Amino acid sequence: MLYADHFTRLQIAKALLLRLWSQGHFRLCDLRVWAQWDWNTRPIGNMAAFYTSVQSSSEYLYGLGVSLADYLFIESDEGSNVKFFAWLPEVPDALFKSSPYESSHPWITDSRKCPGTLQNDSNSWLIYIPFDTCAYRLGGSLLAQAYGHNGGTAPNISDPDYFIDCYEVVRELVEDGIVMSGCTVADGGLATAAAIMCGDGGMELDIKGIMSSYQDCDKT
């Protein structure tokens, strides 16, 4: 696996962001993460990539203040992948030190607090909130392959403090009912998220100012 550290951190962020829209009352540090590595151990370099994946997951979770509740390792003959699932612990943790910022009575459900599609309100705003300060990268994506940039750097996420700040603010807005609808930018990127939010409708989206707002000139 190329960029195992990048991929692992992005998968952690994806699992946590999927809980962002859930009905309930909780903070980021209330959540626990379960991990599953499906890994092909035969190709040369794959075990080094596995080590990198495990190391990056532990370091990133530590930076986020989120505990790893359990993990599963499965040998695979088809490829290597890692998946994460975020939820509240069913019983109080006996092995983990409590965070002073945890909610007193957190709860969560499978239902969403807000829908994932746009609402028909002309007074509302559509806001894109990046949860990291990393530059935009397209390496390994279908879009990059279509444009012949197969060797570019893969997307990354690496600033846990910035992620925490964004998460707590947006989560509070979701719980207070201020956010009318929300969608996670994950697999497929911004275009896929926009398509999901459109539902059966359409959207004219101008994103040419995203890179300039980041002062990012490297398009590889």
Where are these regions (language model features)?
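Active-site pocket-shaping loop/turn-to-helix segments
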Residues: 2-6, 153-162
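Mobile "lid/hinge" segments at catalytic clefts and subdomain interfaces of large enzymes
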Residues: 38-41, 82-158, 171
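A generic local secondary-structure boundary/capping motif
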Residues: 21-22, 58, 74, 112-118
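Short, surface-exposed loop/turn segments at secondary-structure boundaries that line and modulate
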Residues: 26-44
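Small-aliphatic-rich amphipathic alpha-helix that forms the alpha element of a beta-alpha
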Residues: 5-27, 31, 55-62, 169-172, ...
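Glycine-/charge-enriched secondary-structure boundary and capping motifs
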Residues: 40, 46-81, 92-100, 152-155, ...
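A general structural motif
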Residues: 103-110, 157-167, 207-215
